[in-house]
Amino acid sequence: MTKRTLGGTVRKQKRTSGFRARMRSHTGQNVIRARRKKGRHRLTV
């Protein structure tokens, strides 16, 4: 059997679309703001 190669890594996911990554840029902060306004339970990944 061959291995599943398309697993995805948690570290990369957090680094690209985690909370601190979002807060780093102005547009990312807009994303957080919009999700707060909408009432999302999960702001980021």
Curated annotation (Swiss-Prot):
GO terms for cellular component: ribonucleoprotein complex; ribosome. Gene3D superfamilies: 1.10.287.3980. Residues 11-25, 33-45 have a biased composition (Basic residues). GO terms for molecular function: structural constituent of ribosome. Keywords: Ribonucleoprotein, Ribosomal protein. Residues 1-45 are annotated as: Disordered. GO terms for biological process: translation. NCBIfam families: rpmH_bact. Belongs to the bacterial ribosomal protein bL34 family. This is Large ribosomal subunit protein bL34. It comes from Picosynechococcus sp. (strain ATCC 27264 / PCC 7002 / PR-6) (Agmenellum quadruplicatum).
